[in-house]
Amino acid sequence: MSSFACWSLSLLILFYSPGSGEKAFEVYIWSEKQIVEATESWKINCSTNCAAPDMGGLETPTNKIMLEEHPQGKWKQFLVSNVSKDTVFFCHFTCSGKQHSESLNIRVYQPPAQVTLKLQPPRVFVGEDFTIECTVSPVQPLERLTLSLLRGRETLKNQTFGGAETVPQEATATFNSTALKKDGLNFSCQAELDLRPHGGYIIRSISEYQILEVYEPMQDNQMVIIIVVVSILLFLFVTSVLLCFIFGQHWHRRRTGTYGVLAAWRRLPRAFRARPV
């Protein structure tokens, strides 16, 4: 045997020997999606390059159903569902008494289902301050969320949120402004959840439009006219009340006052009518 053949045989023995530290076979895991919504289901494939694996499968704390399997068990396809949080999945196979596994982290997202916008106060005069407040229902992952406060088509503020939260979180953005004449426009808030870094897409949700009612301050002459008119109306009202009271008293006296006393005096006997000297 040539030296080259001996050297090649030695490498093969070293490669397949249990103590060589090299992997005798490979395990692969593939997911239909890298990020999923908590309510959806998707497919995961587990496969190996072992020609005749002893056994294999998918380890997961969630619900799973095996859909298909290779006749020799070289690959298996599963339908996974009911994932409520970020989860690590493991594909494992046993080949010639040796076991090997591969893992895959699947992220879970929750879209911005409800976006609410409030104007505080909803009615202002030109030059007064007001606040725009936008609140979004629990979202995950929060670090991929952007809230945009809009006046018409103009963006007033974009707010992002840091930190990698493991559970859905509410988010709020506020913007303080001074009312202008042009502020009688529609205000709105847009929530954007960007899942592209995780193999997903952009999810957008927008609030109902809110209109800020802006009033012009009254001029001095207008205020004077209003005060004069109100004063005249108040004077006429008070005068009419007093006249009604006076005429009512006069009518009452005519009915029960002077004429009543005179009639009673005439009914007295003549002896009692004499006036003392």
From Swiss-Prot:
Domain of life: Eukaryota
InterPro entries with a match to the protein in the record: ICAM_N, ICAM_VCAM, ICAM_VCAM_N, Ig-like_dom_sf, Ig-like_fold
Alphabetized UniProt keyword annotations: Cell adhesion, Cell projection, Disulfide bond, Glycoprotein, Immunoglobulin domain, Membrane, Repeat, Signal, Transmembrane, Transmembrane helix
Signal peptide: 1-22
Required for interaction with EZR, MSN and RDX and co-localization to microvilli, as annotated region: 250-277
Location in the cell: Membrane; Cell projection, Microvillus
An annotated Gene Ontology molecular function: integrin binding
Extracellular side, ranges: 23-222
GO cellular component, one term: cell periphery
Membrane-protein topology: Single-pass type I membrane protein
Glycosylated position list: N45, N82, N158, N176, N186
Subunit relationships: Interacts with RDX, EZR and MSN.
Function text: ICAM proteins are ligands for the leukocyte adhesion protein LFA-1 (integrin alpha-L/beta-2). ICAM2 may play a role in lymphocyte recirculation by blocking LFA-1-dependent cell adhesion. It mediates adhesive interactions important for antigen-specific immune response, NK-cell mediated clearance, lymphocyte recirculation, and other cellular interactions important for immune response and surveillance.
Recorded family membership: Belongs to the immunoglobulin superfamily. ICAM family.
Annotated protein name in UniProt: Intercellular adhesion molecule 2
Species annotation: Mus musculus
